A protein has these predicted regions:
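Pre-Walker A-like glycine/lysine-rich segment at the N-terminus of P-loop NTPase domains
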Residues: 1-25
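Generic alpha-helix structural propensity
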Residues: 3, 14, 18, 35, ...
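An accessory alpha-helical subdomain
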Residues: 101-198, 202, 207
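Short hydrophobic/aromatic segments of transmembrane alpha-helices and their interfaces
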Residues: 22-23, 94-97, 163-164
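A structural signal for short, well-ordered beta-strand segments
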Residues: 1, 52, 95-97, 142, ...
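Short, conserved catalytic or interaction motifs in soluble domains
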Residues: 10, 28, 197
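Nucleotide-state sensing region of NTPase/ATPase domains
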Residues: 27-112, 118-128, 185-193
Length: 207
């Protein structure tokens, strides 16, 4: 792609969205369209193989993602080196995605706004990506305990440890988000003042 503006043109169903989705997946390790990797694989195919070469940090880098149709876990590579998780992709290929549905974030629930915040922070701060992944893992484990402890009361024994660790990791996640919003608010305030001719003042607050 040209370092300036690139305009992708094509007929319907020629793959324009697929191209953008592939770039976003190599950037973040997830799709902006679906949460299921299975839906990213062509119907009838056993796998999907995404790859790109780019200049990042002043040197040439290669990214690759291989998705499988069965239960086999995906494989992510940077420079041919297999990554343990999508957190390793952080900062290599940074992207900013804007879709028509993004206009609904002001009227939709807070989950949509958190998703946009998480997508940006995971690309910019590897530590945030790791903390968020750990928090989600702890949350899922705790949910399973609370669901199954009636049949196995012993499952409740490690619950205090889960709660303590979730509080620790959750504090890290909150700190990252609050700092990012403060920095973003400074820049957004300047742009909004220019757009409104100085008649309005924009502020972003994380609660």
């Amino acid at each position: 792609l040209h370092p300036g503006v690139n305009l992708i043109v094509g007929e319907n169903a020629q793959g324009k969205t697929n191209l953008l989705e592939s770039v976003f997946y190599l950037s973040t390790g997830k799709s902006f369209r679906t949460a299921r990797n299975q839906e990213l694989i062509r119907f009838g195919a056993e796998f999907a193989d995404l790859s790109c070469t780019l200049f990042s940090g002043g040197r040439e880098q290669s990214l690759r993602a291989v998705l499988f149709s069965g239960r086999r876990p995906r494989q992510l590579y940077i420079g041919g080196v297999k990554q343990r998780s999508a957190a390793g992709l952080s900062g290599v290929l940074t992207t900013v995605l804007f879709c028509p549905d993004d206009l609904l974030i002001l009227k939709s629930g807070s989950s949509g706004r958190r998703k946009i915040l998480d997508t940006a922070l995971c690309q910019l701060r590897p530590g945030y990506a790791q903390a968020l992944a750990e928090y989600q893992k702890l949350y899922d484990s705790k949910s399973r305990i609370l669901k199954d402890y009636h049949d196995a009361p012993s499952l409740l024994e490690p619950l205090p440890e889960f709660n303590y660790r979730m509080a620790q990791v959750g504090a890290v996640v909150i700190a990252y988000r609050a700092k990012f919003l403060r920095e973003l608010s400074k820049q957004a305030r300047l742009y909004h003042a220019e757009f409104s001719g100085g008649r309005e003042e924009l502020s972003l607050v994380y609660q």
